[in-house]
UniProtKB/Swiss-Prot annotation:
This is ADP-ribosylation factor-like protein 8A. Signal peptide: none annotated. Belongs to the small GTPase superfamily. Arf family. Disulfide bonds: none annotated. GO terms for molecular function: GTP binding; GTPase activity. CDD domains: Arl10_like (cd04159). SMART domains: ARF, RAB, SAR. It is found in: Late endosome membrane; Lysosome membrane; Cytoplasm, Cytoskeleton, Spindle; Cell projection, Axon. GTP binds at residues 29-35, 71-75, 130-133. It comes from Mus musculus. The gene is Arl8a.
């Protein structure tokens, strides 16, 4: 009976309450940030993606949640912008190319440098290891270890292994993000 009441209440809320959240998507170049945005926006994977120059902003609506998503370029010249676009967001999404093990150390260093910024303290982080469909890609446990995620103690942090190409774990990623938009406001 209570479960039925909760479902009815959720349906009623969806009719009248619209939720908004703001996310910043960062990570090294070619990790799949723009591809991720396109997959969650349209469900389409495009093999021929052009690297983001500077930043792109896109609004995506999923159910009663509108997501304002900042996709920031991952080339070295744009990394100084990451902090500015991460201030005040509901969550930071950090994309890692899990199949490019040569860049894991650089990716780890960039993530930890970003999270050391005082103005970003407490903002939840979702680390996504993309390209799990490729041979040799790190799984979640390996990503947590190689990215030294257990050392991050001042905020909630979560890690998923995904494939934008195969659309693996995209739904669970969105669920985590939407849940976070709710928990940050309560």
């Amino acid at each position: 009976m209570i479960a039925l009441f909760n479902k009815l209440l959720d349906w009623f809320k969806a009719l009248f309450w619209k939720e908004e959240m703001e996310l910043t998507l960062v990570g090294l170049q070619y990790s799949g940030k723009t591809t991720f945005v396109n997959v969650i926006a349209s469900g389409q994977f495009n093999e021929d993606m052009i690297p983001t120059v500077g930043f792109n902003m896109r609004k995506i609506t999923k159910g009663n949640v509108t997501i304002k998503l900042w996709d920031i370029g991952g080339q070295p010249r744009f990394r100084s912008m990451w902090e500015r676009y991460c201030r005040g967001v509901s969550a930071i999404v950090y994309m890692v190319d899990a199949a490019d093990q040569e860049k894991i150390e650089a990716s780890k260093n960039e993530l930890h440098n970003l999270l050391d910024k005082p103005q970003l303290q407490g903002i939840p982080v979702l680390v996504l290891g993309n390209k799990r469909d490729l041979a040799g890609a790190l799984d979640e446990k390996e990503l947590i270890e190689k990215m030294n995620l257990s050392a991050i103690q001042d905020r909630e942090i979560c890690c998923y292994s995904i494939s934008c190409k195969e659309k693996d774990n995209i739904d669970i990623t969105l669920q985590w993000l939407i849940q976070h938009s709710k928990s940050r406001r309560s």
